[in-house]
Amino acid sequence: MGAIAAGIAMFGAALGAGIGNGLVISKMLEGMARQPELSGQLRTNMFIGVGLIESMPIISFVVALMVMNK
């Protein structure tokens, strides 16, 4: 039962991170197209946002391992 729960948790985290990354990057590209002079600042903010979004699957993976070993 723990393996099923871990798989569902990882699926949700990966799906959410993929959608979130796609939205962040698409909005960053829209902003760069509108204001090219802010591309450096937008890129920096995008990397911070993507890093925070990617922390969700990593934390979910750790929790899934804890659930499976319980």
Swiss-Prot record:
TM ranges: 4-24, 47-67
Subunit-level organization: F-type ATPases have 2 components, F(1) - the catalytic core - and F(0) - the membrane proton channel. F(1) has five subunits: alpha(3), beta(3), gamma(1), delta(1), epsilon(1). F(0) has three main subunits: a(1), b(2) and c(10-14). The alpha and beta chains form an alternating ring which encloses part of the gamma chain. F(1) is attached to F(0) by a central stalk formed by the gamma and epsilon chains, while a peripheral stalk is formed by the delta and b chains.
Residues at the site labelled Reversibly protonated during proton transport: E54
Role, per record: F(1)F(0) ATP synthase produces ATP from ADP in the presence of a proton or sodium gradient. F-type ATPases consist of two structural domains, F(1) containing the extramembraneous catalytic core and F(0) containing the membrane proton channel, linked together by a central stalk and a peripheral stalk. During catalysis, ATP synthesis in the catalytic domain of F(1) is coupled via a rotary mechanism of the central stalk subunits to proton translocation.
One cellular-component annotation, GO: plasma membrane
Entry membrane topology: Multi-pass membrane protein
PROSITE patterns for this protein: ATPASE_C
GO molecular function, one term: lipid binding
The name this protein goes by in its record: ATP synthase subunit c
Annotated localization: Cell membrane
Gene3D superfamilies: F1F0 ATP synthase subunit C
Source organism, top-level taxon: Bacteria
Pfam hit, one: ATP-synt_C
Database matches in InterPro entries: ATP_synth_csu_bac/chlpt, ATP_synth_F0_csu, ATP_synth_F0_csu_DDCD_BS, ATP_synth_F0_csu_sf, ATPase_proteolipid_c-like_dom, F/V-ATP_Csub_sf
Keywords: ATP synthesis, Cell membrane, CF(0), Hydrogen ion transport, Ion transport, Lipid-binding, Membrane, Transmembrane, Transmembrane helix, Transport
Family: Belongs to the ATPase C chain family.
